[in-house]
Amino acid sequence: MFIVHRRFFQNEKAFTPAGKHEKVADGNKHETLATSEYPKVCASNDLYKILQISAPKVGNFTIHDAPVVGLIDSILEYYLYISVKVRKAWIAGYGSQPQNLICFDWERFTGILDQQSLNSPPLAGFVKPDPTSAEPGFLLLWPASGDLFYWERTSLMNVEVSAPEFPGFLHYRIQLKRYESCKNLVSAEPAGFFLTLSSGRLLHLNLKDSDGNSSIQVRILFPGLHIPNCLLSLYNSIFAFTSGRVIPIRCGSIKGPGERLVYSMHSGSTLRIWEIFGTGDHHLLRGFDIYDIILDSIQESFSYVNRFLILDFSVSTSDPYTLACLVSWRDNASLFNYAAIIISFNHQMIPHVSQFCHVRSYLSAILPSVCRIFLPSPGTVVFCVFDVTFAMFHKVRGKEGTFYVEENLVVNNLTSKSRVLDFGMEDAIYEKSTHTLLKTPALILLTEGHGIIRIESSASYLKTSFSATTYLRSRLSQFASQSPLFREQFLLNFDFTYNLSESEVYNTVFNLCDELYTTPCKKNMSVLETLHSQQRDLMEIVLVAFKYLHLSPSNRLQLWLKVAYCSALADLYELLMCNEKMSNLLRRVLKIMSSNDNIDELFLKKCLNINLLLQHLSSEYSQISGQDASNAQKRIEVIVNVNNVYGTIFGNELAYRQEKISKFTDPSSVIRSDLWTVEVDHLDLLRKQIEDSISLHRDVRDSKDAHILKVSNKLRKQILHLVEQNCLLIFDLHNGTDDTIVKSHNFQKFEEEFGNSRKEWLQYLASVGYLEKAIDLAEKVKDFQTMVILLDCLDPKDPTIKLQKQKACLNKYKEEFADVIFFYLVDTEQYASLLHDFLEYQSLLISFFEANDLLNLLWIFEAQNGNYGRASEILFRDCEPEENRIIGKISQLALAKLYSWTNRIEGENIILSNETEVIENHLAILLIQEQYAEMLSSLVDITEDEGEAVEAIVTSNCVNLSENSIRAWLVSSAVERLIQNEYTTLCEMVDFFSSFSLRECSFKEVDLALELLERATITKDVYFYLKDLVYRRFLLQVNWAEIIDAHEDLESSFFPMVKEIMLESDFLIWLQHMEHNIHDESKHYLKSEKNFLQSVYSSLSESQVEDYQMELFREKQIFSVLCKDRELYILIPKLLDVATKQ
């Protein structure tokens, strides 16, 4: 990950941003990234540039070979990959071609190296060549065995050898103690190499003898501690833990041929400076302890610190009098803090701290495994490395002097392709062969999948004054110019400006935008090309700012509208250049607005007053329309041109308010811009322009002139766009939480008037072919009242389209849309649609009915959904006493009777009938409702007469009701008293109990009915007649197919019922009696039955008696067929026998 943080240090004081200056770097200057040439620029800003200086793979080497070790020599510009897995090493120079790749396989030394060495990575180093040779030599050292291989030239590594040595190749085995191993191999070329051992010994390796010939000579520079061999293993483990954190050897300036300064750190803080010669000689120049001076420097800023660690130090090859130390200490939260300490030496070589740079961008709970510091050029830049995090300190010049800016770079180590294998440093002064070159100080990274990456410090920041504007501009330019390789290798942190206030960040970006779109016209570029170029640059900087900066919603909108203004100017200028008729009108207006008739200056200097332009255009059209009222062709041409300008201006404003800004923030949470203030007067101008356009379009849309019709069609499209812009812009302004225009009285009054205008506009759009667009626009601005009206205009042949849109809005807007659509259906008496089409929105419908006291619709809705109890409570809400239980039951039965009756009309559900019948059927329902209400209201006065109440219930004959509670309540003492009444009631009681006997599959219901009849004060003939009727109806209702199957299956659920019926002796006797009379269809039987019926039902007319007689006769015929088909006379004795045995 690559993170950039911004830090300013100047005597530990806060940095105050300066004014705006300097131009933004061109984001297109890195187009060479697409080429195959190296180096490739990955990203850049004012402080540094990041480049890829070698190919990601060389020759046949690929990332799949899993290198685990890397080495880079930034002086000789060579690098090395080592893979233990395949026991190979790949060597290449920065600019090497694939054919020059050197691949070395160390398995050829299996006779020399033991198995442990073959399976472990070697230490390596490049050797500085002779002045006459550009090709370096190479060292490989196996730490455990001490075997050292030296090739005078890297090209010799491909030579197959059979002998231990051959010309140009040397093998030497360093004498190691038991349990001793090699730890670090440090290049001090041209003065040889330094080798640190796990025992603490420091060796100097010289690769030439006194005559200049190749020879390996080893001298002990520091004997280390005298540790017995028995304790050396324990010491090795301790040293291994610390050696990765403290590198004790650093090589400094090259003094001459074969001479170099070397710095070593002993005992944690004792610095020794050596003069080393290629002949193997050495001389100690100075030695001193730097602990106290560093502690004093830390305590100036952090007084609580009393101890610290020196993790690493670095010296520059160009300046022997300056070194940098990376130190660490714990704070009160037990976190490790880090700082870069710059130490300088005076002419007497006495050290003092010249700069303290606290690393504010990195804290850690534990010390990282890799801690490095690099000082490539004193007084310009310092690099610090913490595992995968790099902290860079750049020295810059501000108004109050020089100070350091800290930036934080983090390597993206999520993939193996981005892993960093080694670090190198490139000094400002670079010696190559016999030449001394001046180079840019840089940090070099050897990556696993992207080759060599160079972080190059820039010197430009020391030439000009550095400020917050400069810094922000360079960062935004850097982000905009990132290459794909940079994004893969690094990640960027957006929070690099967290120590600046929001207003400072926004003001700086706003100033950058001003600089961008007021840049002067370049040579050979037209005004229009300049405007489009400025628009692109402005868009780029705003998009990058939105991505990486923390800006408030209002600041985001202000930046967007700055782009909108620039975009509108570009579009207006294009209209001015490309449309001759438009040009005449627009030029005339623009010349009035320009003091020196220089129209281009209005656009280039961004001083065109949009509000004034709209007023002038409105006045121009009014004047022309008044002068040539009868000239329809001229009026329509002028209004089309004026509409083009209105559409360009308001369209750009709206586009950046509504569309593009929605990607970054909620438009309802932003406020308007002060760039060009949208006042009520200007909205009113737009409204007047729309009304004038609609009025003119009405006059000319039926014209027979072909040209006028063509322009009229264009005007129709313009009306659509202008209405859309006006509606959406006002909707956006209305939702601005902090917008002063919304809070003004004028805007509120305007919005009320606009609501009526909007309805008329949308309906006009629907009438001229834009019905669907008008519906969508009404939905966008949440004008649901107009929307439901427009939905009714959809194709009536396919009502599903309208219903789908209505349901989609109900799902999206819930109650907000439900109240509008339901009220509309009620007002237009679309009851069938209201009660049938929206059944899945039951909760919304019920809430709507209840809230608006629409009980006449609510009880029907509940009833058709089967909620009879709830529906009855609603239907009789006004006439039901709370404590009257009888009236409650009556109301339930009455509702059931009513609902059953309405469903039997011609087999249709009255509530679901088509629209032509709904009014008539609704009146019928209300009539029945009034009748039952009158009946129940009369019962209120006689609630103490329980008999009359029960009689009313039974008279209602609600045989379709099956509640157990109602049935049990009917079989009560009240029902017994009912038996004393007319015979008509008794027949209805038989019907009632027969229906329940079927549902309950129980003969108890029949038995109960017969018991009540027997207790009644009726003649014996009447009793036997009714008993015969009860038995026969029961047998007709029993599912005999189930009973026939059950007589052999004793576990069947029907068997208890069969047993119960068969054990009834009266039933068997009656069945045998019926066997003799079942086929009696003679006129004598009919005549006797008729006489009997006339005696029982004396109140019936003769025709009514005959009808009832024929109904009973058909019932007997059905019973006869049933007995024959099912062989009941054979089956019943069998069942009786089975039941008796059981």
Swiss-Prot record:
State the Pfam families in the record.
Answer: Nucleoporin_N
**Which family is this sequence assigned to?**
Belongs to the nucleoporin Nup133 family.
Q: InterPro entries in the record, alphabetically?
A: Nucleoporin_Nup133/Nup155_N, Nup133-like, WD40/YVTN_repeat-like_dom_sf
Keyword Transport attached: yes
Q: Which organism is it from?
A: Schizosaccharomyces pombe (strain 972 / ATCC 24843) (Fission yeast)
State the SUPFAM superfamilies in the record: Nucleoporin domain (SSF117289)
Q: Which UniProt keywords apply?
A: Nucleus, Transport
Q: Which gene encodes it?
A: nup131
The source's domain of life comes to Eukaryota
Which GO terms label this protein's molecular function in UniProt? structural constituent of nuclear pore
Q: What interactions and quaternary structure are annotated?
A: Component of the npc107-120 complex which consists of nup85, nup107, nup120, nup131, nup132 and seh1. Interacts with nup107.
- What protein name applies here? Nucleoporin nup131
Its GO CC terms?
Answer: cell division site; cytoplasm; cytosol; nuclear envelope; nuclear pore; nuclear pore outer ring
